[in-house]
């Protein structure tokens, strides 16, 4: 039986926390930032948790995370 492969694109985007939740970056903080307020940019800079509806799909893409 061959090994199960990890989706590398997903591995670069998601990190598993110690409590078993997945962290992700927020969208909209790479470019075109000039017109966004400082408050909005600060909030976009932080990490967010993956919604519970999406966790199943993330786990399927990252089979070797526990």
Curated annotation (Swiss-Prot):
Keywords: Ribonucleoprotein, Ribosomal protein. The keyword Ribosomal protein applies. The keyword Ribosomal protein applies. It holds the Pfam family Ribosomal_L35p. One of its GO terms (cellular component) is cytosolic large ribosomal subunit. It comes from the Bacteria. One of its GO terms (biological process) is translation. GO terms for molecular function: structural constituent of ribosome. InterPro entries: Ribosomal_bL35, Ribosomal_bL35-like, Ribosomal_bL35_CS, Ribosomal_bL35_sf. Belongs to the bacterial ribosomal protein bL35 family. This is Large ribosomal subunit protein bL35. The gene is rpmI.
């Amino acid at each position: 039986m061959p090994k199960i492969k990890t989706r590398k694109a997903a591995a670069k985007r998601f990190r598993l926390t110690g409590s078993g939740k997945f962290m992700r970056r927020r969208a909209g903080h790479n470019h075109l930032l000039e017109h966004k307020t400082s408050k909005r940019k600060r909030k976009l800079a932080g990490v967010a948790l993956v919604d519970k509806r999406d966790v199943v799909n993330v786990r399927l893409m990252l089979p070797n995370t526990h």
